[in-house]
Amino acid sequence: LLLVVIGWFTFGAKVMKLRSEAKKLVAQSSEDTFKASQTSIVYDTNGKQLLKFKGEKDVYYLKYKELPVYVIAAVISVEDKNFYKHSGVDYKGISRAAVSYVVHKGRITQGGSTLTQQLAKTVFLNRQKTWKRKVKEIFMAVELEKKYSKEQILEFYLNNVYYANGYYGIQAASQGYFRKDAKNLTMSEAAFLSAIPNNPTIYDPRTNKENTIKRRNKILKDMYEQKLIRKDQYEEAINEEIKVKNAQKSKTEKKNYVETYVIHCATKEIMKQ
């Protein structure tokens, strides 16, 4: 009992503070919180792309109904197979992470994170592996599940997760690696892209493609074993050759006359409103 009392006075107040901060952050959030500044594309009258404006991130936002079914199935199968059953936290996973924390003397070596926790970490928190960040992440995941639907959480996650090489979100990754919209991805390509976020360096498609392929194969196997796809679909997808496009070269000139004119016209229209 004495140890419990000492433990509460040592960590209890800190935990309650983290819970309060987590609740406040989620309460203040809205759908716009999960929408980064998007990449803008300018087309001519014939529908041909003229220009693409982007900041530090290459970002496109897709609504839930626009997300490919294969991508959703792939990410759930490998990252959070109990996604539709939990309320933000997988307590078995947390228990494993807690045991690992004790065994490794205060170092966090296992995540045990659900997709909702990963969303909280990506949008609201830093990447530091400390117990405070982990506790806050857990509280935020619970609050996110109270405020948003499972479909919204998937939408937010797949539009914010990092796919290496400056691509944030599934649409940017699909365009960057395959030069196609996410809706046109094959099952194999969807699984391939879903392999990246776990570790964007190790599974970088351009520098470590073999690693990405191995994880793609694991994801496809998980999808088959979880009865998300048929055997013939699995066999076709695992034998499909993945062809990754090279990075597009950015223009060296800052602004040509077309870009300057587009910005000028857009500014005039905004000023009228």
Regions found by a protein language model. Name each.
Residues 45-48, 55-56, 67-70, 78-81, ...:
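Solvent-exposed coil/turn segments that connect beta secondary-structure elements
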Residues 24-29, 55-64, 78:
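N-terminal post-signal-peptidase region of extra-cytosolic proteins
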Residues 21-25, 82, 87, 91-106, ...:
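Alpha-helical membrane-targeting segments
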Residues 50-51, 230:
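Generic structural signal for well-ordered beta-strand positions
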Residues 63-115, 171:
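Flexible, acidic/glycine-enriched loop-and-adjacent beta/alpha segments
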Residues 33-36, 42-43, 66-70, 147-149, ...:
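Extracellular/periplasmic catalytic domains that process cell-envelope and extracellular macromolecules
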Residues 1-45, 50, 102:
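N-terminal type II signal-anchor transmembrane helix
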Residues 107-273:
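Non-catalytic, structured segments within soluble enzyme domains
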